[in-house]
Amino acid sequence: MNTNVPIFSSPVRDLPRSFEQKHLAVVDAFFQTYHVKPDFIARSPGRVNLIGEHIDYCDFSVLPLAIDVDMLCAVKILDEKNPSITLTNADPKFAQRKFDLPLDGSYMAIDPSVSEWSNYFKCGLHVAHSYLKKIAPERFNNTPLVGAQIFCQSDIPTGGGLSSAFTCAAALATIRANMGKNFDISKKDLTRITAVAEHYVGVNNGGMDQATSVYGEEDHALYVEFRPKLKATPFKFPQLKNHEISFVIANTLVKSNKFETAPTNYNLRVIEVTVAANALATRYSVALPSHKDNSNSERGNLRDFMDAYYARYENQAQPWNGDIGTGIERLLKMLQLVEESFSRKKSGFTVHEASTALNCSREEFTRDYLTTFPVRFQVLKLYQRAKHVYSESLRVLKALKMMTSATFHTDEDFFTDFGRLMNESQASCDKLYECSCIETNQICSIALANGSFGSRLTGAGWGGCTIHLVPSGANGNVEQVRKALIEKFYNVRYPDLTDEELKDAIIVSKPALGTCLYEQ
Amino acid sequence: MDYNKRSSVSTVPNAAPIRVGFVGLNAAKGWAIKTHYPAILQLSSQFQITALYSPKIETSIATIQRLKLSNATAFPTLESFASSSTIDMIVIAIQVASHYEVVMPLLEFSKNNPNLKYLFVEWALACSLDQAESIYKAAAERGVQTIISLQGRKSPYILRAKELISQGYIGDINSIEIAGNGGWYGYERPVKSPKYIYEIGNGVDLVTTTFGHTIDILQYMTSSYFSRINAMVFNNIPEQELIDERGNRLGQRVPKTVPDHLLFQGTLLNGNVPVSCSFKGGKPTKKFTKNLVIDIHGTKGDLKLEGDAGFAEISNLVLYYSGTRANDFPLANGQQAPLDPGYDAGKEIMEVYHLRNYNAIVGNIHRLYQSISDFHFNTKKIPELPSQFVMQGFDFEGFPTLMDALILHRLIESVYKSNMMGSTLNVSNISHYSL
């Protein structure tokens, strides 16, 4: 596996599939806007998560894949004394933006109180700038970054990793523009710096999106691990006898803007799982480590609790190393402990009850857990969230085990077995993590009734995209699933959709290549 | 939170940027270089610095060179600066003590500039109510849109609190308490601190600035002026000890005539709500308490705003909300109400709103400039938007004007008057006087 972000250049050869048609269009659009040709294009794909939702920020592994839709940033470098960035979006709903770069080499200010599309570019620019200051401090500590004209074009649906792909492409574009053609950045570095990019707009996320976008490989799913070190391992799908494996990605068209709903959804879940980890640690008298390097884990997480528990009670001083058999055993134990600790409070914990469970005052609890990101809630549902995280992590290991060692008597065995895990994941997301919505559930029901073997939400949820495991090829069900979704969901829920919109709402995809550069 | 969404229309206008002339921008020191300049830098498509004035032209020339203001000209006299047609907006960022003597002739000279549309003055407007009223009249006669930097109104926490109150999340307000710490007015004075801020009459003190910004924020959040007030002002620390940068005493005592304590009580016009407020000077005690607390109690919930210093307008606050509100389901745009919303209408909702990376010193001024730009370019496509408006009052949109400043100055004048007379004053007409 190549460890560096790949670079392609003309003449056109071996381009990733999804890029072949689009790069010409974005160059044309760039020329129409700025009347010059771009120097390069930074590309980052969207992603779907096969299984393993909302466990990455607890440092559990996930099984995503990059898909055939992407964010393209075409860039023309400007060598000016007063450098500025001009951003144009192919979608006219997102207005052009222009801002100057600080002349003294300080960081661009990002206002986290405003929901604004160019802020995601600024996040990518910020983390790239931070990286450049580390690798070349004499050059970047006191002088500005170079200016640029940038055209941004994307067909990634909301919920399909759009914001993460944008920050990855923006970071890569910034590094390429400032370090020149011959500089190679490793996938590991790009993933590491972009994993925290969205924190600068107040969105707390875990890094899985960025890892998938960067590490994606054609025809492979990725097994993304966060501990002990961030690592993405491609796994080829099993070779089946009479079918191919395809994924139908159906967009609910419910737009859950991560920034605006974070206080009741995403940010709140992060706090709930953190509080759950600390409540378990208090109950079983173990100390959770504090990871200062990663602001997601300042107060420990559910994986930390698992490791601490096994160190104290099972004499396993070494943290879990990712081994499948050991992991399954430990996760089953964790689920047992969650039942023992939280099942009497399935209706949720008030602030008073949560602080009591942590042996601290309400004021300490509020200061330590609630002021990191905006949040809004009635009760903290520690039982449901902890159970989801551990059981979902268990399903990921079972899925990986299935992909690596199982043999199937018939193709249907694979589809049935893998599909069951996906369906269990959807049930857990809906009932325990409460990140589904009516539209997601409707789409899953319709797909399952018409040929999908596994259907679930993908991405953060609360709208966005769904993913469906469907046999393709001569005997496949892809077209059947598509038609059923159109007739029973889209025509009912969104009767005014145009054919173009329908085409964009349902994507049939195989795994795609990750982030790359295309030199003009 | 609709009010914090950026306009969906372009803020890269097809028209030319607003050309800004500064009185008081110095690259080496001062408030403008820390706040106004970085704010404008983030809005470079909408604002461009084209002129600088300082009594010593060398200061302006050095600033232009250091900041690389390639479009800016240094002017030797106030008259030539004010007369220049290269300026659309003038920003006054100098000591309050000089406001009157600079702004009055500037407005007169500016009659030679047909392009002047905006006058932006730092709070406080001037040293006294009389001066503030004179400036207000002169600006109104000159015919410019005015802005006062009561930038706390643009804080995302204040806007969120205002939103929660206006949408009924705390029901009707029944009481309010404020406690704050005003910083420089205690037993010690840094030797580098400018002398004028410790002398009464220069327009900068615990009442005009610390109390002024905070009480304006309170009125704005609650959408109410006061009906009655009672205040006591103290100068219990008439001498201060000088200290160096490391906090060591220099053995020298200097006089202080500005107040170090304020006790303020009042009732809001809306709902006859009692408000109690105390401010004190001195070194903040970070270990034991917050140095700014605003508590707003309602029939259905409570709001608390906390800050590390008594300057709400430049602090990264934390907003806490706790309360009940029926039929409150968080919905994504266009989403139908879920069958099982997961919210129990009878249970208490808790919200904690804090943005860890928000730089309030620059951010609130930046959002003020953004509002000016939105107004100038009509980025929200408001039909028949007037070219000028008199005051923001309690609107979410727009920006505070000299009329808003004048109303606040009247309240502050009443604080001193109440202290002197030792009586409760009726201030319910404070926003009604015509000039």
Curated annotation (Swiss-Prot), chain A:
The keyword Chloroplast does not apply. Induction: The GAL3 gene is a member of the family of galactose inducible, glucose-repressible genes (which include GAL1, GAL2, GAL7, GAL10, GAL80, and MELI). One of its GO terms (biological process) is maintenance of protein location. PROSITE patterns: GALACTOKINASE. Keywords: Acetylation, ATP-binding, Carbohydrate metabolism, Galactose metabolism, Nucleotide-binding. GO terms for cellular component: cytoplasm; cytosol; nucleus; transcription regulator complex. GO terms for molecular function: ATP binding; galactokinase activity. Disulfide bonds: none annotated. Pfam families: GalKase_gal_bdg, GHMP_kinases_C, GHMP_kinases_N. Belongs to the GHMP kinase family. GalK subfamily. The GAL3 regulatory function is required for rapid induction of the galactose system. At normal induction, galactose in the presence of the GAL3 protein may lead to the induction of the GAL genes, including GAL1. Then the galactokinase protein (GAL1) in the presence of galactose may reinforce the induction leading to a higher expression level. Upon depletion of galactose, the inducing activity of the galactokinase protein may decrease, after which transcription of the GAL genes, including GAL1, may decrease. This is Protein GAL3.
From Swiss-Prot, chain B:
One of its GO terms (cellular component) is cytoplasm. InterPro entries: Gal80p-like_C (IPR055080), Gfo/Idh/MocA-like_OxRdtase_N (IPR000683), Gfo/Idh/MocA_oxidoreduct (IPR051317), NAD(P)-bd_dom_sf (IPR036291). It comes from the Eukaryota. The modification N-acetylmethionine is found at residue 1. Keywords: Acetylation, Carbohydrate metabolism, DNA-binding, Galactose metabolism, Repressor, Transcription, Transcription regulation. To K.lactis GAL80. This protein is a negative regulator for the gene expression of the lactose/galactose metabolic genes. It binds to GAL4 and so blocks transcriptional activation by it, in the absence of an inducing sugar. This is Galactose/lactose metabolism regulatory protein GAL80. It comes from Saccharomyces cerevisiae (strain ATCC 204508 / S288c).
